[in-house]
């Protein structure tokens, strides 16, 4: 299966903390991206891994770097030209446990669309039907540009798919809550809290 790790965000809240981009945080001797790529190959021998980034210095064994053609809005992390059938979007600023990656790989193809995460954060989107996901993505993007909604993220795509209010954090059909540990790093506080919990 094709896995696209989204690592082309602005990182404004992270603000180059410790002189690093979020994706270059090292935990247990490897960066977040190195860990995710390694685990994907461990649990899916046929994994094709793509990392979306304009950083020409980014080279991770086992992954190909791709420069998105359009990265204006936050929703554009879902690189439109890479959306297709039988694929998965993952987040480059997330620490994935082995169990989380195993859950993602094992649920490939289970539903037309399957969002995976906690009650607070989406950590993966499994796509069996690329045309459906692209339609939802384009609808949310258009609604945001027209001023009909105030946020334009993965949550809005999920809520449109599930028939839930677009401004909520409700969870319904097509969402798998994983108890497996994942942690996203949006700010220095996120990182420091995680490290303090490891000691």
Where are these regions (language model features)?
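N-terminal nucleotide-binding beta1-loop-alpha1 segment
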Residues: 1-18
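Hydrophobic targeting segments
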Residues: 2-5, 33, 48-49
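Short, polar loop motifs at secondary-structure junctions
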Residues: 10, 50-58
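Short alpha-helical oligomerization interface
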Residues: 18-24
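A short, N-terminal amphipathic alpha-helix
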Residues: 30-46
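Short phosphate-binding loop-to-helix
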Residues: 56-90, 95-99, 103
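Conserved core of the sugar-phosphate nucleotidyltransferase
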Residues: 96-180
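C-terminal catalytic/acceptor-binding lobe
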Residues: 174-199
């Amino acid at each position: 299966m094709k896995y696209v790790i989204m690592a082309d965000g602005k990182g404004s809240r992270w603000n180059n903390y410790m002189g690093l981009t979020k994706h270059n945080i090292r935990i247990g001797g490897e960066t977040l991206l190195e860990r995710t790529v390694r685990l994907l190959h461990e649990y899916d021998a046929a994994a094709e891994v793509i990392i979306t980034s304009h950083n020409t210095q980014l080279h991770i064994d086992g992954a190909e770097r791709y420069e998105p053609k359009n990265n204006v809005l936050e929703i554009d992390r879902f690189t439109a030209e890479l959306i297709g059938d039988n694929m998965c979007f993952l987040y480059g600023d997330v620490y994935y446990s082995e169990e989380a990656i195993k859950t993602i790989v094992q649920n490939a193809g289970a539903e037309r669309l399957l969002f995976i995460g906690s009650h607070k954060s989406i950590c993966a989107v499994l796509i069996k039907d690329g045309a459906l996901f692209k339609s939802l993505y384009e609808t949310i993007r258009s609604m945001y540009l027209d001023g009909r909604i105030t946020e334009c993220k993965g949550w809005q795509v999920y809520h449109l798919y599930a028939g839930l209010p677009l401004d909520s954090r409700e969870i319904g059909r097509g969402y798998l809550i994983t108890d497996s540990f994942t942690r996203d790093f949006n700010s220095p506080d996120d990182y420091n809290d995680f490290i303090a919990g490891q000691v």
